[in-house]
Amino acid sequence: MRHILNLYENINSTARNNSDCPAVILPEEIFFTVSIVGVLENLMVLLAVAKNKSLQSPMYFFICSLAISDMLGSLYKILENVLIMFRNMGYLEPRGSFESTADDVVDSLFILSLLGSICSLSVIAADRYITIFHALQYHSIVTMHRALVVLTVLWAGCTGSGITIVTFSHHVPTVIAFTALFPLMLAFILCLYVHMFLLARSHARRTSSLPKANMRGAITLTVLLGVFIFCWAPFVLHVLLMTFCPADPYCACYMSLFQVNGVLIMCNAVIDPFIYAFRSPELRVAFKKMVICNW
């Protein structure tokens, strides 16, 4: 969010005066390289699903939704670097109307990436729940039509929320609402998880075992959720500290890691496709076919 980033620049000198922790500055080339890799990897996921009819199922469509979210996060940093480069070359007027509009568009991509990731993980969690505990009715409950409707509503809601957050980003309540979405949605997913694994344990006692493929999907979701929390939580905490205690020495010390937290977000988009490939034999085969055909 432009308001958050500008606020960071304004309080940076104050933070340094109140903390012995120097700001960690990373080369822009690192951000750019990681972002490019993230875009290419997630684009491979989308192409693999698009080219293989065997992968065109609700589960993989939900995975594609998460891949799009990751790709938007990488595109955000690429476009931001391009805007900075043009401004440094004198092609953009600092704080001009075009730059402000471009900043809003880029910031919308960033917010959309976070909201899309949270919502996509929630949908995948619900899909895994139905797969495990309503396996016989799964194909009648989770149809392609319903999956597409859910994804359409999901992205329409995320887009509207993203535009609203960017438009009113200078208001503290908006920042609070933005950061509150993160723990609230994660709480929903974790509650679903606890319920899922408690039922799985109960079912395992009454029956021989749950289908291994279904449990593999649940484990994949667990890994995806863990990586998401690890990569995004530091930034969300940074936003909260920047809003409520920017001059506190301890808060300022943590905020000196601003760029490191940014790299973690970019790394999320790079790690997720490896998780898909490692946990899904079908997707792994599709990746191999794509690589062999290109060679």
Swiss-Prot record:
Topology feature Extracellular, residues: 1-23, 80-104, 169-180, 245-256
UniProt key word Amino-acid biosynthesis: no
Chain ranges passing through the membrane: 24-49, 59-79, 105-126, 148-168, 181-199, 218-244, 257-278
Gene Ontology MF terms in the entry: corticotropin receptor activity
Membrane topology field: Multi-pass membrane protein
Residues on Cytoplasmic side: 50-58, 127-147, 200-217, 279-295
Keywords annotated in UniProt: Cell membrane, Disulfide bond, G-protein coupled receptor, Glycoprotein, Lipoprotein, Membrane, Palmitate, Receptor, Transducer, Transmembrane, Transmembrane helix, Ubl conjugation
One GO cellular component, as annotated: plasma membrane
Residues that carry a glycan: N12, N17
PROSITE patterns from the UniProt entry: G_PROTEIN_RECEP_F1_1 (PS00237), G_PROTEIN_RECEP_F1_2 (PS50262)
Changes after translation: Ubiquitinated by MGRN1 that may be involved in post-endocytic trafficking and/or degradation of internalized receptor.
Lipid moiety-binding residues (S-palmitoyl cysteine): C293
Disulfide linkage: C21-C253, C245-C251
Subcellular compartments: Cell membrane
Keyword Transmembrane helix: yes
Tree of life domain: Eukaryota
Similarity annotation: Belongs to the G-protein coupled receptor 1 family.
Role summary: Hormone receptor primarily expressed in adrenal cortex that plays a key role in regulating adrenocortical function. Upon corticotropin (ACTH) binding, facilitates the release of adrenal glucocorticoids, including cortisol and corticosterone. In addition, MC2R is required for fetal and neonatal adrenal gland development. Mechanistically, activates adenylate cyclase (cAMP), the MAPK cascade as well as the cAMP-dependent protein kinase A pathway leading to steroidogenic factor 1/NR5A1-mediated transcriptional activation.
Quaternary structure and interacting proteins, as annotated: Homodimer. Interacts with corticotropin (ACTH). Interacts with MRAP; this interaction targets MC2R to the plasma membrane. Interacts with MRAP2; competing with MRAP for binding to MC2R and impairing the binding of corticotropin (ACTH).
Protein name: Adrenocorticotropic hormone receptor
Naturally occurring in which organism (per UniProt): Ovis aries (Sheep)
